[in-house]
């Protein structure tokens, strides 16, 4: 959650779902954020209905009270004053950084790793915007859309009057149409200390090469090229095996964003309708266009104006195809090709890290090197034979 969602001390708690657990977040009287199991340890009533007061969250069922670390402070229904000492709510450590609440769900006795130095995580509030939306599928199949550059010229393309696919160029993105014209990009995929860099080479009109560079950062972060001075990154937060909350951050490293650029702070995706947010985690950030109405596909628009026929909103278009795979796609039925090299490499990197942790207790790559996350997506045009890694070194820095 964002810090502002929890409000001032002793404000109302908020439901949170994370890694399949139902939790409740609150800010105590001293301003410390607590993240507890939603179930009261007494009889399982939801602490969401609790009273946040005087240094803890009090269950309204029998008045038991817990602090931000899960310690039971009071059990007023019990005659023994020492009874509370043997009761504890499951609690997870939280850290606030620049308007975002981060939680550590690892072993309670372990040392939490430092927070990654993601560009958006350190940008000033006035320099960034936030979009949040739900993806009703597994987090990895959703994330893979950001490392799959080949789909851009198909799914997101428009149709001109001749029936040709187009992604019209803009003043702040003059090479945008190249992804719709060169549909077979040449990929160069490179591992780095915190993930994978994906560079897609397409032919430009004048014989040069247009390079579109994206980043995968372990385990749930991506960054793709944005327009103009803006930078863009996402966090694909697993609510459970079949639901993902996408945090999209756009930021300018040095200047405040305009009102138009920051309109996403309310959690709305430009160009698409969204239901009013409820407090239930699986109702937050739901598109009006969904599986229930076939994502409002318009077959006439598909024939004349839009390759997909879906709304002119990339997140909605991505949701339609990714959710259509099912909650967890059966990857044993896939037929991967050369254009899927980045998908293959990201999966391999995740599997290698998971096995190393399981078999030898080896921490995932980059976890103790927060500076290795200072990478972002970018784009540039180079002459044939130019070294894209050297030419983009500065551009890739977040």
Regions found by a protein language model. Give the residues of each.
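C-terminal catalytic domain of Rieske-type non-heme iron oxygenases
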Residues: 8, 32, 108-398
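Rieske [2Fe-2S] iron-sulfur-binding domain
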Residues: 2-129, 175, 186, 195-197, ...
């Amino acid at each position: 959650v964002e810090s502002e969602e929890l409000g001032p001390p002793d404000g109302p708690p908020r439901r949170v779902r994370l890694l399949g657990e139902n939790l409740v977040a609150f800010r105590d009287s001293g301003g410390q954020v607590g993240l507890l199991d939603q179930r009261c340890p007494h009889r399982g009533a939801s602490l969401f209905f609790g009273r946040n007061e005087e240094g803890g969250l009090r269950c309204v069922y029998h008045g038991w009270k817990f602090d931000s670390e899960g310690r039971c402070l009071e059990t007023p229904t019990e005659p023994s004053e020492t009874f509370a000492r043997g009761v504890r709510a499951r609690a997870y450590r939280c850290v606030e950084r620049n308007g975002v609440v981060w939680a550590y769900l690892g072993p309670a006795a372990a040392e939490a790793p430092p927070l990654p130095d993601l560009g958006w995580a350190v940008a000033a509030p006035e320099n960034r915007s936030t979009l949040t939306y739900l993806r009703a599928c597994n987090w990895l199949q959703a994330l893979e859309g950001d490392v799959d550059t080949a789909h851009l010229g198909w799914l997101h393309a428009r149709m001109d009057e001749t029936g040709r696919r187009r992604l019209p160029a803009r003043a702040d993105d003059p090479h945008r149409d190249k992804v719709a014209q060169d549909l077979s990009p040449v990929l160069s995929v490179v591992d780095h200390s915190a993930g994978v860099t994906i560079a897609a080479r397409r032919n430009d009109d004048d014989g040069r090469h247009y390079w579109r560079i994206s980043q995968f950062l372990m385990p749930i972060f991506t960054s793709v090229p944005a327009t103009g001075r803006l930078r863009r990154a996402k966090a694909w937060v697993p609510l459970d095996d079949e639901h993902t909350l996408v945090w999209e951050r756009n930021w300018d490293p040095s200047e405040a964003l305009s009102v138009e650029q920051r309109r996403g702070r309310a959690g709305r995706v430009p160009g698409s309708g969204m239901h009013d947010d409820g407090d239930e985690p699986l109702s937050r950030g739901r598109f009006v266009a969904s599986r229930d109405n076939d994502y409002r596909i318009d077959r006439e628009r598909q024939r004349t104006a839009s390759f997909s026929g879906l709304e002119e909103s990339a997140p909605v278009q991505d949701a339609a195809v990714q959710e259509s795979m099912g909650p967890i796609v059966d990857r044993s039925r896939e037929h991967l090709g050369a254009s899927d090299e980045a998908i293959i490499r990201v999966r391999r990197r995740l599997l290698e890290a998971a096995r190393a942790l399981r078999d030898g207790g080896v921490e995932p790559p980059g976890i103790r090197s927060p500076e290795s996350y200072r990478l972002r997506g970018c784009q540039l045009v180079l002459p044939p034979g130019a070294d894209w890694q050297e030419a983009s070194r500065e551009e890739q820095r977040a």
